Amino acid sequence: MKKIKCALIGPGNIGTDLLAKLKRSSVLEPVWMVGIDPESEGLKRARELGVKTTAEGVDGLLPHVLADGVQIAFDATSAYVHAENARKLNALGVMMIDLTPAAIGPYCVPPVNLKEHLGKREMNVNMVTCGGQATIPMVAAVSRVQPVAYAEIVATVSSRSVGPGTRKNIDEFTRTTAGAVEKVGGARKGKAIIIINPAEPPLMMRDTIHCLTETEPDQQRITESIHAMIEEVQKYVPGYRLVNGPVFDGKRVTVFMEVAGLGDYLPTYAGNLDIMTAAAARTAEMFAEEMIAGNLTLEPVVA
């Protein structure tokens, strides 16, 4: 079976977890890991897995892109550098899957809008944030039943699972997540809050989703819609589960979720890594299947 070759930029928590998932993919083959620190743990681990590495950033990868047939790149660095990375790689015809909150390209939350991206020939799609991937499906589950005037999501993650890149991007995280709660989740107004909890032992990712419906909530239909959506998410993140809810209080619908990871890199408490990396891998696989079938040919993009 032909596989589409990929590069990963950023050998931190997210990049390392993603590498483990891509290694199992039937249509994607990770061939490069890009970092900026020669001593990086993530680069060392990638080399042990037989992946080529460079510590010279994206510029260290560019000369090899065409020779090694790289067609998809995952950016797990920081919102500040993503635009430059994307420009350089898009110019060589490489499609970007953006795991930073840069959000240059359209938002992608697989169970809600993955299919919409097919056939649009986008060269950059944004995976929102871990908080977005965990909560937007729930907002969408309510908004597909009836209009949501306001949605507020709170993502609580363990301190140990949040690396330096994510910490530098907290403001971008909240802005990008709130934007996608509106655009993909379907809420008229969205708000996002992230809590980084330093407790030891580290706690599992928890997410609270509040939706205010415009009219009295149709409890039965909303409950059915939420359960159906949870099953969709579980297809690629089996540790996604409902802890409580939906709880109805007037026009407010509240759902409490917990996300356990597969333990590919950090232990299972780091469900925030899994929901992000599994969504990114799922998205890339869909594009890869189209390329293998001959329905999608990537063209260089001149910025």
Swiss-Prot record:
EC number, UniProt record: 1.2.1.10
GO biological process, one term: catabolic process
Alphabetized NCBIfam families for the sequence: ac_ald_DH_ac, PRK08300.1
Binding site residues for NAD(+): 161-169, 272
Protein origin, superkingdom: Bacteria
Organism: Burkholderia vietnamiensis (strain G4 / LMG 22486) (Burkholderia cepacia (strain R1808))
The entry's keywords: Aromatic hydrocarbons catabolism, NAD, Oxidoreductase, Plasmid
Keyword NAD: yes
One example GO MF annotation: NAD binding
Family named by the database record: Belongs to the acetaldehyde dehydrogenase family.
Known catalytic reactions: acetaldehyde + NAD(+) + CoA = acetyl-CoA + NADH + H(+)
List of catalytic residues: 130
SMART domains found in the cross-reference section: Semialdhyde_dh
Name of this protein: Acetaldehyde dehydrogenase 2
Top enzyme category: oxidoreductase
Record InterPro entries: Acetaldehyde_dehydrogenase, Acetylaldehyde_DH_C, NAD(P)-bd_dom_sf, Semialdehyde_DH_NAD-bd
Top-level taxonomy: Bacteria, Pseudomonadati, Pseudomonadota, Betaproteobacteria, Burkholderiales
